[in-house]
Regions:
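Bacterial N-terminal signal peptides
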Residues: 9-19
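Loop-centered beta-sheet repeat module
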Residues: 236-279
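Solvent-exposed N-terminal domain segments of exported/luminal and surface proteins
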Residues: 27-254
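Bacterial N-terminal signal peptides that target proteins for export
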Residues: 2-10
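Boundary at the C-terminal end of the N-terminal hydrophobic targeting segment
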Residues: 21-24
Length: 279
């Protein structure tokens, strides 16, 4: 009997511990979003030396002229570099340069330069996305060892704006706002060390369940996004199509991907689509 009580007490403690680890943040903590923290969870204040300014709401749509296609002109076109890092002074800035940048200075001492401009914190999101992030903060929790999300369907963006673990930071990147449903034309170059390169051209389409009003909520409940990519050049690859249903909890339901091979005129499942593929 005594052993049974000990086991029951231990199980209860483990349950409480698991609940505390997996719990979303409190309403009081979430209230920091938009106050001392930006709506997406960054520090609103700048740094001590002023090289990183305070966030003041981000870039507004009236910050510069908009062209006929709806693209914003460079609002900082008139700025000049504060200084330029070259092979001659790279040692002075060594603590702020990556190993790759230092290697570039050694390999191309005459031509490789890094002009350093003033920092601007331009990130801004629609009010609905900021509200979604706050909703995520008090509701969303990780499941399946951090490989999935629970209570995320109501918000759909920025799963953990006040992250407590590295996994939650990664989820914020995965669930970031990307401007809604998107269609883009991409040209991909693979340069060689001798300067030669080959080009592959794609048409990409991305759709998010939150921006698909006609989608049955039950069908999209575990889908983060839908992705379609069609190759348009070179001719040997043109017509190939990739379709992906990117799932949220990939332990519960792995990523669904298919490839249409125009040369073979066949559709096949594509389990190899992962990590940095497709490019």
């Amino acid at each position: 009997m005594k052993n049974t009580r000990i086991l029951q007490t231990g199980a209860l403690l483990l349950s409480l511990l698991a609940s505390s680890v997996m719990a979303a943040v409190s309403e009081q903590e979430a209230a920091q979003l938009g106050a001392s923290l930006t709506p997406l969870g960054g520090e609103m204040a700048g740094n001590a030396d002023g090289s990183i300014p305070a966030w003041d709401g981000g870039l507004s749509t009236s910050a510069a002229a908009v062209d006929g296609k709806g693209f914003l002109a460079d609002p900082y076109a008139g700025e000049q570099p504060l200084f330029t890092i070259t092979a001659a002074n790279a040692e002075q800035y060594k603590d702020k340069l990556s190993a790759g940048q230092l290697a570039m200075f050694k390999r191309y001492p005459e031509s490789y330069k890094i002009p350093v401009y003033p920092s601007h914190r331009t990130t801004a999101v629609p009010a609905a996305i900021a509200a979604a992030a706050k909703l995520s903060a008090v509701n969303t929790t990780p499941v399946d060892g951090g490989n999935g999300l629970q209570n995320f369907n109501a918000s759909r963006y920025y799963a953990f704006p006040i992250p407590k673990t590295g996994v939650e930071v990664i989820w914020n990147h995965i669930t970031r706002y990307r401007g809604g449903n998107t269609r883009r034309v991409v040209t991909q170059a693979t340069p060689q060390t001798n300067g030669s390169y080959s080009l592959v051209k794609f048409e990409d389409e991305v759709a998010f369940p939150a921006d698909m009003p006609d989608l049955d909520p039950a069908k999209g409940s575990n889908v983060l996004l839908y992705f379609k990519q069609r190759v348009t050049a070179p001719s040997r690859l043109a017509g190939n199509v990739l379709l992906v249903h990117e799932t949220i909890d990939q332990v519960k339901e792995p990523r669904l991907a298919w490839i249409y091979n125009a040369g073979q005129r066949r559709v096949r499942r594509a389990p190899q689509v992962a990590y940095d593929g497709p490019g």
